[in-house]
């Protein structure tokens, strides 16, 4: 009995603080009788209670939001003594239209907040409900603003992406809340992405929405390696014609089932318009790649637009300056920009799927003239050693030297059958010159993957439609034009600096066996030919470069373009965007 009384006493002692705490928080469930006479101290206590008991995602934004409330003594951000829902309605209006950015309102708890707001207007809320509404609005507001400014998904979660993007910090949180108090509508309008590319994708999304309810019969795939050639009959032809009529490449004909039985010139012209838009090979045949693109639903095309708008949010053009280079790995092209306008365009060769070109942002800091090529270990093991087993003359033909412990050796003395991942002690270096795999010019930029832009000794590759053929580096079609782009644009009044740059360009030309162009270059070549040979040029300023992956974009002519997802990254990002929420 004594033990029983002892445990009763212990239970009472433990329970007293809990009962006391529950009693002190009982006002949380009190209905606020008159919003005009709102008890601010009770609301602040309710907000503190809400922040300490609700499990929001443990990201930096949540931490900074809590810190903002703490430093402002848990004052309400959205609810004041005289309840004015204008600011709340303004935020909800923007959230209701978040679909223009590829997300859905309920990913921001739109229904829950709307329900609380309606109750706020038509009934009386408890202090806890007011606190919940206030903190929920704050989280929604910051997530929305930060998402538009920096992206809703961190690209770092994907293996292929190696971009260090900006994130919402304490300064951003403070700025956003200060703007909320004074200029909410202007701030929400100002934070919308406004680059030409982004706005164009939004406009094209609206255009594709017009077709969302349009239906068309699936076009049956052809048998393996089969194609439909110009002038041939195929039962799929009228279905292809019908699909092209929906999006306007082909003029509507109600008798299409009989009008289009043969693959004729009119259909070819319409089909080529579609193939240009989707980056398909232009020829006088229809293959399964074309049929697969035609069979994509309009919802799938819209999803492709949404995914690529998110990619644009990751790297705002404003962070790159007025002059930069953007390699679109998915399109296998390079665009050099000046003031948001394409100044130079060229084809490139990129890494195949098993050797993906890393997606990153950096700065080109130097040009290497007549580079040597140190062969990567993986290529030695997987490719060159296997060739050498059958043909050791490969090394001489390709001007490749073999080294062991720093000394050059005769490759014919090596047992190449013993080379594998665990045993590869040799270093291979290809001599500089016209036969070098890197061509005559290499563009170095800082990165952790030893990749770079470079010329090539195999120019024919640029004629191919599929140029995802490299081991990860990017081969450029027009290296000399890219060199000229990398030089600073000077005002004509700086004649001495212009002459100096022209001479440097001529030194590059002379070093790769091209004729010099400038008067200064010609005079220097005559008077002092030795100084005309150079090995490297350090750029000043450095040129920003983005290795990007846009499977949907607007071309320089203002036309929307879709590209094959060669690295299968669209579906990964789409899943993350769909799964995005506040928790």
Named regions from a protein language model:
Residues 150-154, 168-191, 197, 270:
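A sensor for short, sequence-defined functional sites
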Residues 8-10, 15, 98, 212-215:
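Prokaryotic Sec-type signal peptides and long signal-anchor helices
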Residues 22-70, 135, 142, 162, ...:
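Well-ordered beta-sheet/strand-loop patches within structured domains
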